[in-house]
Amino acid sequence: MQITRVEATPRSGEGLRDVRGDVVRRRLQADHSIQLTEVRSIVGFLINSDITAEQISQRADDLFADPIIEHSLTNQTFLQSKEIFDQVPDAVISVGFKPGVTDNPGKAALDGFRTIFPNASIESDISTYITYAFYGVKDQATPEFIASNLYNGLIERAQISTAEMCENNEWPMIEYPARPPQEFKQPAHIDLEINDDKLIEISETGLLALNLEEMKAIQSHYRDAVVRRTRQEVGIVENQPTDVELECLAQTWSEHCKHKIFASKIHHRDLETGEESVVDSIFKTHIMKPTHDMQQEVDWLLSVFHDNSGVIAWDDEWSVCMKAETHNSPSALDPYGGAMTGIVGVNRDILGTGLGARPIANTDVFCFGPPDWQGDIPENLFHPSRVLRGVHSGVRVGGNESGIPTINGAIIFDERYLGKPLVYCGTVGLMPRKLPDGRESHIKTPTAGDIVYMVGGRVGYDGIHGATFSSLELTEESPSSAVQIGDPITQKKMIDMLLEARDAGLILSLIHI
């Protein structure tokens, strides 16, 4: 196995332009009044494979570049080419993903690579990076400031060449992000016979987002004599949960999964009349109960509140399902990745409804701080205009690459969304009322002894603690691991495969986990 570097950059000439570079140039001008004469871009591919550099070079234009509008180069960088880059830039910045973080462009390139080289090692892998060359910077901004607007340090790494380094031909060279070897560790047993301060410490250090009352409820559960006896009978440590058990409880009780605020008792006082009342769960009182009451009167509410999405009968042949959810905290840390994960996640909720529905349309509502905000921004959080662009792009790309159009939406601006945006992602799905074998498509039929498969894209190091993180306030120490990056292209393949399996009668039950 060896690393081969392939780069592609737009050609210059009449009618040709560097779109990526122009987008960055206009963004810096709009957000920071930085007037640049030009920004040029290079897309890089780092190929870890047993295929030789010579073989790759011969096919570079078939996969990594469009020879009509782009140049390609193997095991060199275009910045060293005086023919292509005939002027010395004022700054150069290269951006790539950190080791283990999901790299969707790399995955797509790898699919094509394996098509062209079917005998390549199964261990072959491709990572990507983008290099930007800036002209006309002068004293308007430092390279470090420009870089801070190009990459997200939670999931990406950047290398910078200053004007002096550029004059000396010292160019940034992003290297292949080798993943550290994975080591299996036995689950740790957690002693809960501790004081309240230590219970809170376990919750905080483990990003469990559980308050003292919840931690004490868990402590009480593992003190229960029946629980201890049952655990002892099956060979489990009777009085100490594993860290995995605590993670499962914390995820189940998270705001993302449990919606504790909507489920709690709300003490309400009417400011005009002074009348006081208690609402026992906004969700159960004002959403579930009216829906169940309606279900008694109509025959078209087929499935509500117990599956991945609700199902209604559209006509005698088709059912429609719809689901919407928020993805606020991840979108604050990484607007593009957080929003993309939100939309492809709710796509999977539709797919996981009943025996499988096809997602056919997306919708969204975004709430951000004012895009022209001139005040302070908390450290490690982004300006509202950057959040707006990233979220919009993430939802757009997530839908388009899955083959699901976004048909409508709304955007609201308010100062109260400076600290955390509100990102609603919704999907509409379609399913036949009955499958070819006569089963009703909205009814799952699992039985004991069924074979269970888990399908999807490869899991990266991103997205850990994403559910529990939804219950925490955003701070300067918010964890990078909580940001997950979706993979819409792989998901599109999965959707088509599962719906084909559904129609063949192979699926008894499925769920989005």
Predicted features and spans:
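Conserved small/polar residues in nucleotide/adenosyl-binding loops
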Residues: 511-513
